[in-house]
C-alpha cells in the first residue's frame, strides 16, 4: 500500500513514460561509450564548476580540471568585477598557464595578471596578452591575436557554469529549465560556511549518480546507521518518496528525509545530544531570511517533507534540507570505470562554537554516510 500520493497512472515511471523494460548496463562498462560521452556530453553541455563566493574580489580565481573534456579552465573575477572563464592554456606553446606545485592539481588565489611558467608570457584579467619576452625577436607578432581563449560562462543563483561548446546558443537559465526556475530566490548566498570532501572512486560516474537518486537501497543499506525510530520509518516507508519530477534531462526527488531531532534522544550518540546535530544536519534550523519556500521545494507541500534532491544533467546534484542547509554533489569522470566524487556542505555561518561543531559533526557524519 502506498504511503504517499502517486500519479493517476499508478507509478511515477509510467507517469513520465520512462519505459518498463530492462535497462542496458553497457553504457557503464564500455570504454567506447565513455569516449562518446566525453565529446557528446562534457564538451557540449553546461557544467557547474563552483560558486561566486569563491571569487570574492577583482583578481580572485580558481582552476577546474575537466578531465572528461580533456581540458582545464581558469575561472576569475575580471577588472570589471564580472565572472569569466578561459581555457587554462598559454597561447604560446600550449602549456598549462595557472598551476602551483603540480600541474594536475586545482588551485586558487588572487592576482593582477597570469604569467606562464615556461616563457613568461603574461595575460591580464580580461584575458588579453600584455607581455611577450623579447617581443622584438618575433616576426609580425600581434599580441591582440594571442589572448586567452574564452569559455562561455554564466551564473544561476550564485552557481557558476561553463559551456565549452561554441556552437551551443542555449542560455543557461533555459537549459536548467523549470526545476531550476522553481528554486529562484532560495538564499544560497547566505550559506557561506563551506566544507568540502573529495574521493577518487573506482566506478563509472553514472553508477554513483544512480545510487544517489534512488531510495530503494535506504532501508537495507542505511538501516543500522539510523536510530531506532528512524530505522522503523525506513522499513515502513523508506522505499517511497513524496514526489518525483522529470524535466528534460533533469530530475528531482522529494523525500520525507530524516528526523531532526530524533524522537527518542536516548537512542542517539552522546555527542549528537550535546551538539544537536547528526546524520541529517544540525537539528536547530537557522534563520535564512525567507518566510515561505520557493515553489520548487516540497512541491507536494507534505508535512513530512525533509529534503529535495535535484539532479541537473549531466553531473550536478543539489540537496536542500528542511533544516536550512545545502549539500551538493559532483561526479567528474576520469575514465569509463573511475570518477572524482565531490561533496560540498553549505551552512549559514555559525554564531557560536557549539553551532560550528554541530555543522562539523554533520559534515563528517554525512561523509561516512555518503561514502
Q: Where in the sequence are the language-model features?
A:
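Generic structural signal for secondary-structure transition and capping sites
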Residues: 42-46, 95, 217
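Short, compositionally biased low-complexity segments
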Residues: 1-18, 180-186
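Rieske [2Fe-2S] iron-sulfur-binding domain
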Residues: 55-166, 170-181
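A common structural microfeature
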Residues: 38, 43-48, 61, 70-72
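C-terminal catalytic domain of Rieske-type non-heme iron oxygenases
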Residues: 82, 154-155, 159-371
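Low-complexity, highly charged intrinsically disordered N-terminal segments
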Residues: 13-40
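Short Pro/Gly-enriched beta-strand edge/turn motifs at strand-loop
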Residues: 44-49, 56-57, 132-137, 310-315
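Alpha-helical packing segments of well-folded alpha/beta enzyme cores
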Residues: 33, 45, 69-71, 204, ...
